[in-house]
Regions:
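Predominantly soluble domains enriched in secretory-pathway, periplasmic, or organellar proteins
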Residues: 23-231
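Sec-dependent bacterial lipoprotein signal peptides
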Residues: 1-22
């Protein structure tokens, strides 16, 4: 019975995703100029699912002041639907917008878009292996996408074993040497081990239901938090 409920939930979610894929329109408006001071904190506001009201804020501890809706104000259009995560690398912010199927690259001082990676299924997190190679985890997909951040394009994918498009879910990533570990979250219970030189899954670890957070401590030990799933 539980398997049947899970199946129908995933079918409904897949239909919703199909209905909204390609329907996101960017409504452009006026822009503002910014020059953010160093030492601030970026705050990603997820927003409500299917409302397209995700936003980006910047808080400066020295002045105790915050600026809100910075992406929209700097670029003239909204960030999108469900801002999932943000990664900073080499002075560039990479904002993963899950239900808009896009990753924006932004200047950290002006908040202006410098590029975007599109045609993603339902991106969750991005992990950089080099300036020209990164992995992107996904929901509702049995693949981890390989992207070239310099060219803002998808260059390949990693097939995850025993996952279908409907049951696919990869989440957070940590790296130890040449190996990358990926938690498999929604309705999953595994952590995958990927050889980053061959872009293949070489091993897996079964854990509790729905491992979400994943970190590596300074002693080389990996920690995960499982949320236990839901009925």
């Amino acid at each position: 019975m539980r398997a049947a409920r899970t199946f129908f939930r995933r079918i409904a979610a897949a239909l919703l995703l199909a209905a909204f894929t390609g329907c996101m329109k960017w409504d452009y408006g006026p822009t503002e100029e910014f020059a953010a001071p160093d030492g601030g904190l970026f705050i990603l506001n997820e927003g409500n699912f299917q409302y397209g009201n995700a936003s980006l804020s910047y808080y400066h501890p020295a002045t105790r002041q915050a600026e809100n809706e910075l992406f929209r104000r700097a670029n003239g259009f909204k960030l999108g639907d469900v801002a999932q995560s943000m990664t900073i690398r080499s002075g560039v912010g990479w904002v993963v917008v899950n239900n808009s199927h896009v990753i924006f690259a932004i200047d950290l001082r002006t908040f202006r878009e410098t590029g975007r990676i599109t045609d993603l299924t339902s991106p969750r997190y991005i992990h950089f292996l080099s300036d020209e190679k990164a992995y992107v985890t996904q929901l509702w997909d049995n693949r981890i996408f390989i992207v070239n951040p310099k060219r803002y394009e998808i260059t390949g994918c990693i097939e995850c074993p025993r996952m279908t498009m409907e049951s696919g879910s990869t989440e957070q990533m940590v790296q130890h040497g040449k190996y990358l570990f990926v938690s498999c979250w929604s309705y999953q219970n595994r952590i995958l081990k990927i050889d980053t030189e061959t872009d293949t899954v070489v091993d897996e670890l079964v854990v509790g239901a729905q491992p979400a957070s994943l970190v590596m401590d300074k002693y080389g030990k990996m920690w995960t938090v499982t949320d236990g799933g839901y009925e």
